[in-house]
């Protein structure tokens, strides 16, 4: 039997892809998206430099405290104990023994800034994590449910937005610590309560946009439960936004903790944070400006680096940037 040449020239239809092939294709697309984002981030010189400086600050805060415990590393272990008091070394100035000078009690600032950085950065990341958890839960439920529920949840957020950030954080801190003893976790919870609104609103907007996509409607059409749609189709696609949100929320939390500690409402001594070190240095900043300048410089550098990193991540993960690149 003769075969029509035109019929023979038509492409043969490929068999429909299996579920495994669908999953493999999705994994490849997701991998290429993150690879493309990484390439774009590495091309952003400002964001790359900010990331390097950010890592250096974190390593300094993590590694320097361990050196006090190793004999022979420093000239004197006592000199580099952040809580060791030696009035004969009060405001000793810059030297090899005290690279960042000393405070009024003769405590080495090189060690104290490192330990204070541990506390400030730990509070920043812990509060940011809690902010994102609350924001994801609240925002995703509000955006997915929609209707009157969404409207009511957003009006509640609007009411909270009307509260000034720092006074709200101060009041929350005082409520959680009526005795006046403020711990690290008290500070984390206080800053979380005062800061989670923006994350919730961002996640809500992303979920509202994503839930109109065909793959979400298809999942609903086949009877997928709401929590499965959220967990499998919506929340994974907000990952890029959440990564950016980490470095957008971190500066505000670090500044909030520094402000509360600077005005005497932060973590109780002898626990040091960058804000409390700056508070100690304000008494003699006219004669010894380095005691106030160094912790403030550490705060400003970390905040600027986090902002540059967030900008770089936003540019790298923005689909419109990828399309025009």
Language-model regions, residue ranges each:
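Short hydrophobic alpha-helical segments within the ABC transporter permease transmembrane module
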Residues: 112-114, 156, 203, 207, ...
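Gly/Trp-centered helix-boundary motif
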Residues: 1-136, 140-141, 148, 223, ...
């Amino acid at each position: 039997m003769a075969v029509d040449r035109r019929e023979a020239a038509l492409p043969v239809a490929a068999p429909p892809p299996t579920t495994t092939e669908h999953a493999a294709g999705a994994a490849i697309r997701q991998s290429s998206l993150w690879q493309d984002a990484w390439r774009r981030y590495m091309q952003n010189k400002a964001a790359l430099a900010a990331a390097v400086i950010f890592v250096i600050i974190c390593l300094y805060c993590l590694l320097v405290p361990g050196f006090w415990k190793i004999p022979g590393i420093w000239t004197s272990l006592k000199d580099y104990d952040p809580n060791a008091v030696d009035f004969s070394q009060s405001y000793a100035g810059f030297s090899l023994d005290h690279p960042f000078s000393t405070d009024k009690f003769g405590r080495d600032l090189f060690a104290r800034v490192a330990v204070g950085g541990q506390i400030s950065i730990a509070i920043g990341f812990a509060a940011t994590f809690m902010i994102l958890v609350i924001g994801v839960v609240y925002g995703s439920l509000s955006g997915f449910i929609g209707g009157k529920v969404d409207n009511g949840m957003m009006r509640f957020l609007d009411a909270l937005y009307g509260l000034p950030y720092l006074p709200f954080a101060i009041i929350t801190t005082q409520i959680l610590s009526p005795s006046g003893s403020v711990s690290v976790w008290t500070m984390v919870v206080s800053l979380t309560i005062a800061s989670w609104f923006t994350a919730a609103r961002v996640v809500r907007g992303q979920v509202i946009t994503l839930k109109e996509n065909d793959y979400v409607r298809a999942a609903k059409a086949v009877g997928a439960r709401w929590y499965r749609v959220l967990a499998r189709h919506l929340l994974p696609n907000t990952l890029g936004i959440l990564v950016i949100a980490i470095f957008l929320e971190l500066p505000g939390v670090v500044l909030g903790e520094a402000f509360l500690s600077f005005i005497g409402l932060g973590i109780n001594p002898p626990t040091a944070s960058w804000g409390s070190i700056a508070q100690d240095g304000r008494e003699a900043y006219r004669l010894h400006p380095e005691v106030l300048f160094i912790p403030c410089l550490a705060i400003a550098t970390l905040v600027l680096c986090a902002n540059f990193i967030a900008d770089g991540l936003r540019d790298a993960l923005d689909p419109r940037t990828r399309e025009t690149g």
